[in-house]
Curated annotation (Swiss-Prot):
UniProt record, GO biological process: translation
Native source species: Jasminum nudiflorum (Winter jasmine)
PANTHER family assigned: RIBOSOMAL PROTEIN S7
Functional description taken from the UniProt entry: One of the primary rRNA binding proteins, it binds directly to 16S rRNA where it nucleates assembly of the head domain of the 30S subunit.
Gene name of the record: rps7-A
Protein name: Small ribosomal subunit protein uS7cz/uS7cy
Record bears the keyword Ribonucleoprotein: yes
Subcellular location: Plastid, Chloroplast
GO molecular function, one term: structural constituent of ribosome
Family: Belongs to the universal ribosomal protein uS7 family.
InterPro entries: Ribosomal_uS7 (IPR000235), Ribosomal_uS7_bac/org-type (IPR005717), Ribosomal_uS7_CS (IPR020606), Ribosomal_uS7_dom (IPR023798), Ribosomal_uS7_dom_sf (IPR036823)
Chief place where the protein resides: plastid
Keywords on record: Chloroplast, Plastid, Ribonucleoprotein, Ribosomal protein, RNA-binding, rRNA-binding
Length: 155
């Protein structure tokens, strides 16, 4: 048995402009090649674009979009008897938010159009209304989990 104590769970820092942890999680997912200032610029431009499109608080739109995209259940591949099975597992709120952020970014990168700020803002607005690529991904995951419900005991 290990003599070391259990590691303290780290809390995400909040960003300087909005003072919001969710925004900071988003910035850390946008980040590419360590260019954090570029990620900040991209997100702030996106939120300004959201404000222009909806004339509402962009943070509330962001929260609503992430809430709607966050999955309750996911599937995980497990090997049993030479075959791989997709086993449905429940996921926690933090992991669910991380998945939602990842799906939102992936869906906005796939969108046609100009710059990333515009594509990401469009995806956020669509997700807050309950449509778009990220919502489709969530529904697809839920369908997959429902189809493989018989393997739920494999966990």
């Amino acid at each position: 048995m290990s003599r070391r104590g259990t590691a303290e769970e780290k809390t995400a820092k909040s960003d300087p402009f909005y003072r919001n942890r969710l925004v900071n999680m988003l910035i850390n997912r946008i980040l590419k090649h360590g260019k954090k200032s570029l990620a900040y610029q991209l997100l702030y431009r996106t939120l300004k674009e959201v404000q222009k499109k909806t004339e509402r608080n962009p943070l509330s739109i962001l929260r609503e979009a992430i809430r709607r995209v966050t999955p309750d259940i996911a599937v995980k591949a497990r090997r049993k008897g030479g075959s791989t099975r997709q086993v449905p597992i429940e996921i926690g709120s933090t992991q669910g938010k991380a998945l939602a952020i990842r799906w939102l970014l992936a869906a906005s990168r796939k969108r046609p159009g100009g710059n990333m700020a515009f594509k990401f803002s469009s995806e956020l607005v669509d997700a807050s209304k309950g449509k778009g690529g990220a919502i489709r991904k969530k529904e697809e995951t839920h369908k997959m989990a429902e189809a493989n419900r018989t393997f739920a005991h494999f966990r």
